[in-house]
Amino acid sequence: MTTIMLVRHGRTAWNREERFRGRVDLPLDELGLKQAEAVGRRVAAAWQPAAVYTSPLRRTQQTASAIARACGLETTIHTGLLDIDYGALAGLTPEEAAEQYPALARAWRGAPHTVQFPGGESLVDVLRRAQMALAESLTSHPAQTLVLVTHVVVCRLLLCAVLGLDSSHFWHFEPAAASISVFQISPERNILLSVNDTCHLAGIGA
C-alpha cells in the first residue's frame, strides 16, 4: 500500500485577492514562505517520504523545496501536477469574471465539471494528467510514502477520484494553503486518512 501526502502550496498574493491563478507563475508571499517551512517540518517529523513530486510552477516548487530540505530529499517536477489553465479568466477576480463571463462564472460555481475555460482547460483535462502523474509516482515508488505538491484544483480532483466521486463533487473539498491530505492506495482499495490538515500552521499568522 502506497501512502500519498497531497500538499497544496503556500499562500500567494493572488490567493489573498482570490484571483484566478492557474498557470500564472506566482511566488509565495511572506506568509506563504512561512507556511512552506511549517509544512516541511511537519512532514519531516511525522512521515518518512521516499520522494517529493511537484508542479513546475514557482509557488509549488518553493513549497516542495522546503519539504524536501526538511526530509533530506530532492524534488521531482511533474507537469501533470500543474494548475488548471484558466485561459481568458487568468488574473481576474470572481467579481470581474462574473461581469465579463456571467454564464461561465455561474456554471463554474454550480456545475464545474461542465466548464471549458476559453483558451484554457476543463476539469477533465486536469484530472487526466493528474491521474497520470499519480500513476507514474506509484509505479516508481510502490509501497512507499510520497509527497505530491500541487494546486487546489488538482487537490480537489484527486480527492474526488480517490473516493470514487466524479468531478461534479469538486466543490465538496476546500484544501487550504499549505494543507496536507493523506490517502493510501492499493489494488484492493483506497483509504482516505485525513483531509485539509493545517495543525502545523498554528501560530504563524494568517
Predicted segment positions?
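Short beta-strand scaffold positions
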Residues: 54-55, 128, 149-150
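Short, active-site-adjacent cap segments at secondary-structure transitions
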Residues: 13, 59-61, 83-85, 154-156
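Phosphate-handling substructures
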Residues: 27, 69-131, 184, 191-194, ...
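Active-site-adjacent alpha-helix immediately C-terminal to a catalytic or transition-state-stabilizing loop
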Residues: 61, 69-71, 132-191
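Active-site-proximal alpha-helix that buttresses catalytic centers in soluble enzyme cores
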Residues: 2-3, 11-77
